[in-house]
Amino acid sequence: MILLKLYLTLAAILCQSRGTTSLDLDDLMTTNPEIQNEIINKHNDLRRTVDPPAKNMLKMSWDNTIAESAKRAALRCNQNEHTPVSGRTIGGVVCGENYFMSSNLRTWSFGIQSWFDERNYFKFGFGPTRAGVMVGHYTQVVWYKSYKMGCAINLCPN
């Protein structure tokens, strides 16, 4: 059985207002093992809360190859297009991707929580609870077969 890898990208568009944040871009770099742990722990914590509970939810772990792919996606600064499938295929597995964009710096936990909060518009066994709502970020976070991930952040000029 081929297990899916989850590939998440936090492609942040950042235009800081003076004095509104104490975060620095360096504080969010995914080359920092503490940031990697924050991202993994947040995903695993949220995945444990799905309702109904998954019978066989896999635990997420960090993957540097996926993180490099996420970095390439984040560097593109393309907020309207996902990476082509060929750019998201790692080890023969097509990976999903999530983007989070903000006009000011946010923690990784904030962005991941915003994806997870799409659960308010999702019903297990049914799908979106109404037309036009986003639930794909949520389903990427909680997909039970996903077990590896990598993330990246970038400051985009526009």
Swiss-Prot record:
Residues 1-22 form the signal peptide. GO terms for cellular component: extracellular region. Keywords: Calcium channel impairing toxin, Disulfide bond, Ion channel impairing toxin, Neurotoxin, Potassium channel impairing toxin, Secreted, Signal, Toxin. Disulfide bonds join 77-156. PANTHER family: CYSTEINE-RICH SECRETORY PROTEIN-RELATED. This is Cysteine-rich venom protein VAR7. One of its GO terms (molecular function) is toxin activity. It is found in: Secreted. Residues 41-158 form the SCP domain. Its main location: secreted. Belongs to the CRISP family.
